[in-house]
C-alpha cells in the first residue's frame, strides 16, 4: 500500500508507515479502515459496526449450537414466552437457558417438585399480575421459602403480558380497562376494533401486537427489570 502525493508533478508515491508529517506533527500513514458491513433493514448496529440484539446487548459471535443448562426460566403462558424470546432470545440461546411454560401459576410448585431446584440448577419464574396480597404473591412466597436461594419468583403488575408492550406501539395512549367478567384478551381486541370472536382472532391479535415490538425500548420498565434480574439469577458463574 502506498500514499500518493497529488500536489507534485509527476505524482509521487510513498510506502505507508511512519515518516510523514501533518500540520507540523509526525504521523504514521495507515491504510483506510474497511467500512462496517451495512445492516439489513431493522437491524441495530453500534458505531463500531457490531450488531446489537433486541435486548440492547452486543450480539455474540456465532459459536454454534449450545447445550441447554440445567438452570432455566419459567413463564406463565405462551404469549409471555414468545415476548421473552423475541427480545431476549439471542442472549438466552448464547447462555444455554431454556424458557418453559407453567400454563398458570397454580402449577408452579408441582413443576418445581419435578425439576428439583438447587443452587447450581436454578429456577427463575416470571409471574403475571403479582401484587401484594394476591394469590400469585402467596404462591411465590411459599416456593421461595421452600427452595431458598435456588428459586427466584418475580412478577410484573400487568394483568396480562400484552400490557407490558407500550400502548403507543398499537396507537393507544393507555391500555383499556377491561371490566371483571370479560376476558382481558377479548376485551382488549374489542377496544382496539380488531377481530375477537375466537381463539384464532386472539392468536392473530397477539401476533399483530408482538410484531410492533422492535427492541426492549418498546416494553414497559416494570417488565424489563424483572426479566433482566431473572436472567442474571440463572446465569451466575456456578449455575449449571
Model-derived regions, located:
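Activity-critical C-terminal alpha-helical subdomain
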Residues: 142-217
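Charged phosphate-binding loop/patch that engages nucleotide di/tri-phosphates or the phosphate backbone
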Residues: 209-240
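Acidic, glycine-rich catalytic loops of TOPRIM or P-loop NTPase phosphate-binding modules used
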Residues: 60-124
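Short acidic, S/G/P-rich loop/turn micro-motifs used as interaction or catalytic elements
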Residues: 106-107, 130-134
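Short, charged, intrinsically disordered terminal tails
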Residues: 47-58, 232-240
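Short, small-residue-biased leader/transition segments that mark boundaries at the very start
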Residues: 2, 6-9
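Short, aromatic/basic amphipathic alpha-helical patches
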Residues: 113-115, 134-147
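Intrinsically disordered, low-complexity, charged/polar segments
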Residues: 10-54
